[in-house]
């Protein structure tokens, strides 16, 4: 289960980074902001999983 969450975090980070870059490239501030928000969500999920791993071991 934790592996699924880690993969989901990486996917959110990559998707958000790509969306933010695309938004900046076309001058769409809303798309860039949404992409950054998705990346941040992935960052938060990854931090949560790392914290869980610390207490697991």
Swiss-Prot record:
Pfam families: CsbD. InterPro entries: CsbD, YjbJ_sf. It comes from the Bacteria. Residues 1-15, 36-57 have a biased composition (Basic and acidic residues). Residues 1-57 are annotated as: Disordered. Belongs to the UPF0337 (CsbD) family. This is UPF0337 protein SAV_1088. It comes from Streptomyces avermitilis (strain ATCC 31267 / DSM 46492 / JCM 5070 / NBRC 14893 / NCIMB 12804 / NRRL 8165 / MA-4680).
């Amino acid at each position: 289960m934790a592996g699924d969450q880690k993969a989901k975090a990486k996917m959110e980070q990559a998707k958000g980074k790509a969306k933010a870059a695309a938004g900046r490239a076309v001058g769409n501030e809303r798309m860039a902001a949404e992409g950054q928000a998705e990346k941040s969500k992935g960052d938060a999920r990854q931090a949560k999983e790392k914290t869980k791993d610390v207490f697991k071991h």
